[in-house]
Amino acid sequence: MHCPFCSATDTKVIDSRLVADGHQVRRRRECLLCHERFTTFEGAELVMPRVVKQDGSRQPFDEDKLRGGMLRAVEKRPVSMDEIEQALSKIKSTLRATGEREVTSKMIGNLMMDHLVNLDKVAYIRFASVYRAFEDVSEFGEAIAKLQNDKSKSGKS
């Protein structure tokens, strides 16, 4: 691995440990020439299906877009980064598990809502309001009423 400070090709690994539930390896490295230390992360590159948008166009899966949508929904809510990363990981695993080369943006949106409803109800309503393009206050009321009905049916208080 090249040193990011002096571009030397000789570096040594000082420490390695598993992170992200064992899906990544974090390595502390030291350059043998300039003695600067830096961190690298190593993970398997998994092929994600392409996304078919509502207008029929196709584009590569964009994890940053998925993460951005979730972060906007949970902004200023009591949801930890670990919970967010776990939800994103589960969504990606579900998409890969379909075995399909292409998935619809609608499927991704529904998976996002399924995870948000379990993480934080307010974040779920925020995301649903944009995803389902709520036009007026009554649609918010309907979504909230549905959440409350689902809560009472599941026996939670």
UniProtKB/Swiss-Prot annotation:
UniProt gene name: nrdR
Q: From which organism does this entry originate?
A: Shewanella loihica (strain ATCC BAA-1088 / PV-4)
Its GO biological process annotations read: negative regulation of DNA-templated transcription
ZnF segments: unnamed: 3-34
Domain ATP-cone: start-end pairs: 49-139
Instruction: List GO molecular-function terms, semicolon-separated.
Output: ATP binding; DNA binding; zinc ion binding
Record-stated family: Belongs to the NrdR family.
Put simply, this protein is called Transcriptional repressor NrdR
Q: Kindly state what the record says about how the cofactor is bound.
A: Binds 1 zinc ion.
